[in-house]
Structure formats: structure tokens, C-alpha cells
């Protein structure tokens, strides 16, 4: 589930 958290941070940072 750590991967999802990392992706979430990347997505939020990309927005």
C-alpha cells in the first residue's frame, strides 16, 4: 500500500 501513497503524493504534487 506504500506504492499507492507515493503515487498519491506525486499526483497531488503534479496537480
Swiss-Prot record:
- Localization per record: Cytoplasm
Keyword Hydrolase in record = no
Q: Which UniProt keywords apply?
A: Cytoplasm, Elongation factor, GTP-binding, Nucleotide-binding, Protein biosynthesis
| Disulfide linkage | none
List the GO cellular component terms: cytoplasm
Which terms does the record give in the GO molecular function aspect?
Answer: GTP binding; translation elongation factor activity
Please give the function described in this protein's UniProt entry: This protein promotes the GTP-dependent binding of aminoacyl-tRNA to the A-site of ribosomes during protein biosynthesis.
Family in the record: Belongs to the GTP-binding elongation factor family. EF-Tu/EF-1A subfamily.
Protein name, please?
A: Elongation factor 1-alpha
Source organism per entry reads: Microplitis croceipes (Braconid wasp)
Amino acid at each position: 500500500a506504500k506504492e499507492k501513497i507515493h503515487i498519491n503524493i506525486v499526483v497531488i504534487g503534479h496537480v
